[in-house]
Amino acid sequence: MSKRNPLERYRNIGIMAHIDAGKTTTSERILFYTGVSHKLGEVHDGAATMDWMEQEQERGITITSAATTCFWKGMAGNYPEHRINVIDTPGHVDFTIEVERSLRVLDGACTVFCSVGGVQPQTETVWRQANKYGVPRLAFVNKMDRSGANFMRVREQMISRLKANPVPIQLPIGAEDKFAGIIDLVKMKAVYWDDASQGTKFEEREIPASQQADAATWREKMIESAAEASEELMNKYLEAGDLAVEDIKQGLRARTINNEIVPMLCGTAFKNKGVQAMLDAVLDYLPSPLDVPAIKGVDENGLEDERGPSEDSPFAALAFKIATDPYVGQLIFFRVYSGTVKSGDTVFNPVKGKRERIGRLLQMHANQREEIKEVGTGDIAAAVGLKEVTTGDTLCDPNHVITLERMDFPEPVIHVAVEPKTKIDQEKMGIALNRLAQEDPSFRVRTDEESGQTIISGMGELHLEIIVDRMKREFGVEANVGAPQVAYREAIRKQVEIEGKFVKQSGGRGQYGHVWLRMEPNEAGKGFEFVDEIKGGAVPREYIPAVEKGLRDSLSNGVLAGYPVVDVKIALFDGSYHDVDSNENAFKMAASIAFKDGMKKASPVLLEPMMAVEVETPSEFMGNVVGDLSSRRGIIQGMEDIPGFKVIRSEVPLAEMFGYSTILRSATQGRATYSMEFKHYSEAPKNVAEAIISKK
């Protein structure tokens, strides 16, 4: 099959950043300059192409990652045509999961920084996620025209807070309302974009005299960075004291792809300056599917396997997102790592053990779609007609099975009870919630056994608000929502050895299960760990999985207030059995009895979710804000100055943060903003724990 673009001319990139850094506007400009979109979509008009759900247009924030394909030949039309698949990811912390799934399937990313706000909490989160997946990235310092814009301050924050190695390949010409263009340090030219053509035309001039010395200094640093890529480049540099443009690009590209440096660019997407040069940098420095390591997985025998990027290899893809489209139904977004697939082909989903037929294949441009017949290695596309697929599943050739690594999804930290307003809504609500849970793995639905209520859980208040809103808009279900509840956890603080016995022997076939367990605290965040220490067959092999199952089932219900138990290590080290009466169920029950007993004796404690809270407030309100955070059991961890504002970093229990935005608005005349994200679980103080336990 001949492709319009060879694989080395593919770029799968994400645009990621903190909320309000200008990420969606940047993505919009990419679509405009690559010729896909003929009218610029502005976020504050509610018309941005990438933000396609109604809630996104109303709130002016991006919730779901829209995937778009576009083509670019360079700002001056001097590159062969490249195909860029862009994924716009949300910056609001409640939707971190969307960022996580996008990064899993991307080869590179552009991180957008606000020139005034710099490195903000969500920037740190997405940066950590990108580190986890080893995604090479560029830094685009946006909003250079804003009051307080400071390119070099963002560079310093990237070093101090992100531990990154930023290498400026551009410098701004002027700043704030004097921002006029950029200095391209690779070519040593000043670049100015034409306002009348909305930035589609540009001209190169000599660098302004006042900035020539500065440009020479930073160019020297950039060339040193490029030369470190290889011995050959270093020798060229040492001999000539300079490097040719192609050598600079080659060196910077190699080091970017190895995650050793982050090329830094600048501009203002809103004023149509700099995004065009950023697109050129995507071609120059970010990897193609050929530059990234082969994707790893396991074959049907559980042995390690991998697939390199080749159309001749068997088909393997990862489903990274599910969305419901009002016209075509459920769309499964997937990234192809090897091989090709046509509409009508049958694929195998090893996670579910199911074969499915692909109906139609669509290439997405935000919420417009183009039907295609075939997709190949490196492509990101959407399929219609796959019923059983959930996020993170593998799709592969039925004759060459591979299961790609699944994604890790965070546990929800907040839950609310929802009740349908009418009997008619009852059934529809179940369908709606299950569909939404299938789309979003960080959203969970369960029924409370005691009250019979439907409980929905998610990553924050906004996350659940949007779920309820979507239920109403997309499924026509009206629901009453209870007050948000914190997802507490239980853990133990000391080691105990405990016996569990389940015996029923009254004539006929009886029940006999007997175990000795050692329970001890596990490292924070490690979860539940089961260790089999049985020697000499005290508990027969075939019953050991039943013991583990009995323990896992018991974890969901702690002894203090019925919250799930975390971070516990349990070893099965002894027990006994009966030739006739022992069975799996008896050992499951014995394990469960021992667990309940052991929990009571192992100094159980209540854990509460702690949030990293960052408040940006005008300096005059700092005292009020700090006092209020302290009254919420907050621990102030640091402060920073930005012109006219103070940034306060703190850690506060989630339970104390409900309704905080309203309080903060009134305490600062609406001028402060804050962001909050889950940090870790921590032991609740005695008085707090007692109050929670007494309510249960």
From Swiss-Prot:
GO cellular component, one term: cytoplasm
Family annotation (Gene3D superfamilies): 3.30.230.10, 3.30.70.240, Elongation Factor G (Translational Gtpase), domain 3, P-loop containing nucleotide triphosphate hydrolases, Translation factors
Compartment(s): Cytoplasm
Role of this protein: Catalyzes the GTP-dependent ribosomal translocation step during translation elongation. During this step, the ribosome changes from the pre-translocational (PRE) to the post-translocational (POST) state as the newly formed A-site-bound peptidyl-tRNA and P-site-bound deacylated tRNA move to the P and E sites, respectively. Catalyzes the coordinated movement of the two tRNA molecules, the mRNA and conformational changes in the ribosome.
NCBIfam families associated with the record: EF-G (TIGR00484), PRK12740.1-3 (NF009379), PRK12740.1-5 (NF009381), small_GTP (TIGR00231)
Residues noted as binding GTP in the record, renumbered to the chain: 17-24, 88-92, 142-145
Biological processes annotated in GO: ribosome disassembly
The tr-type G domain, residue ranges: 8-290
Protein name: Elongation factor G
Domain of life: Bacteria
GO terms assigned for molecular function: GTP binding; GTPase activity; guanosine tetraphosphate binding; translation elongation factor activity
PANTHER family per the UniProt record, alphabetical: RIBOSOME-RELEASING FACTOR 2, MITOCHONDRIAL, TRANSLATION ELONGATION FACTOR G-RELATED
Protein family per UniProt: Belongs to the TRAFAC class translation factor GTPase superfamily. Classic translation factor GTPase family. EF-G/EF-2 subfamily.
SUPFAM superfamilies: EF-G C-terminal domain-like, P-loop containing nucleoside triphosphate hydrolases, Ribosomal protein S5 domain 2-like, Translation proteins
UniProt cross-references to CDD domains, sorted A to Z: EF-G (cd01886), EFG_III (cd16262), EFG_mtEFG1_IV (cd01434), EFG_mtEFG_C (cd03713), EFG_mtEFG_II (cd04088)
Residue pairs linked by disulfide bridges in the UniProt entry: none
Keywords: Cytoplasm, Elongation factor, GTP-binding, Nucleotide-binding, Protein biosynthesis
